[in-house]
Amino acid sequence: MGTRLFFYVALCLLWTGHMDAGITQSPRHKVTETGTPVTLRCHQTENHRYMYWYRQDPGHGLRLIHYSYGVKDTDKGEVSDGYSVSRSKTEDFLLTLESATSSQTSVYFCAISE
């Protein structure tokens, strides 16, 4: 059996105003074997154009992995190696760890903005 990784997917509420941010991430927690692909889903109900995936590691602030500025329009962030994204509809932005490695053990955050 291969090494297992623990991915903690946290909900990032980068929103001012009311408490319902209109954004969810799934799964909330993920344990997987190294070498296995893992997909994290960010779902929004606010119809915002911009969506972001970040990771936070001990001793570091948030680091941008990928972002999207519309359906099928995505770009890389500062730590994009080993990740891919897709956004086939406004509501969902998927982050895939192509082949999970121990260096990808992190807290993952999704955010949205207009």
UniProtKB/Swiss-Prot annotation:
<dbReference type="InterPro" id="IPR050413">
    <property type="entry name" value="TCR_beta_variable"/>
</dbReference>
<dbReference type="InterPro" id="IPR013106">
    <property type="entry name" value="Ig_V-set"/>
</dbReference>
<dbReference type="InterPro" id="IPR013783">
    <property type="entry name" value="Ig-like_fold"/>
</dbReference>
<keyword id="KW-0391">Immunity</keyword>
<comment type="function">
    <text>V region of the variable domain of T cell receptor (TR) beta chain that participates in the antigen recognition. Alpha-beta T cell receptors are antigen specific receptors which are essential to the immune response and are present on the cell surface of T lymphocytes. Recognize peptide-major histocompatibility (MH) (pMH) complexes that are displayed by antigen presenting cells (APC), a prerequisite for efficient T cell adaptive immunity against pathogens.</text>
</comment>
<feature type="disulfide bond">
    <location>
        <begin position="42"/>
        <end position="110"/>
    </location>
</feature>
<dbReference type="GO" id="GO:0002250">
    <property type="term" value="P:adaptive immune response"/>
</dbReference>
<feature type="domain" description="Ig-like">
    <location>
        <begin position="22"/>
        <end position="114"/>
    </location>
</feature>
<keyword id="KW-0675">Receptor</keyword>
<keyword id="KW-0393">Immunoglobulin domain</keyword>
<keyword id="KW-1003">Cell membrane</keyword>
<keyword id="KW-0732">Signal</keyword>
<dbReference type="Pfam" id="PF07686">
    <property type="entry name" value="V-set"/>
</dbReference>
<dbReference type="InterPro" id="IPR036179">
    <property type="entry name" value="Ig-like_dom_sf"/>
</dbReference>
<feature type="signal peptide">
    <location>
        <begin position="1"/>
        <end position="21"/>
    </location>
</feature>
<dbReference type="InterPro" id="IPR007110">
    <property type="entry name" value="Ig-like_dom"/>
</dbReference>
<comment type="subunit">
    <text>Alpha-beta TR is a heterodimer composed of an alpha and beta chain; disulfide-linked. The alpha-beta TR is associated with the transmembrane signaling CD3 coreceptor proteins to form the TR-CD3 (TcR or TCR). The assembly of alpha-beta TR heterodimers with CD3 occurs in the endoplasmic reticulum where a single alpha-beta TR heterodimer associates with one CD3D-CD3E heterodimer, one CD3G-CD3E heterodimer and one CD247 homodimer forming a stable octameric structure. CD3D-CD3E and CD3G-CD3E heterodimers preferentially associate with TR alpha and TR beta chains, respectively.</text>
</comment>
<keyword id="KW-0472">Membrane</keyword>
<keyword id="KW-1279">T cell receptor</keyword>
<protein>
    <recommendedName>
        <fullName>T cell receptor beta variable 10-3</fullName>
    </recommendedName>
</protein>
<dbReference type="GO" id="GO:0007166">
    <property type="term" value="P:cell surface receptor signaling pathway"/>
</dbReference>
<dbReference type="GO" id="GO:0005886">
    <property type="term" value="C:plasma membrane"/>
</dbReference>
<keyword id="KW-1015">Disulfide bond</keyword>
<keyword id="KW-1064">Adaptive immunity</keyword>
<dbReference type="GO" id="GO:0042101">
    <property type="term" value="C:T cell receptor complex"/>
</dbReference>
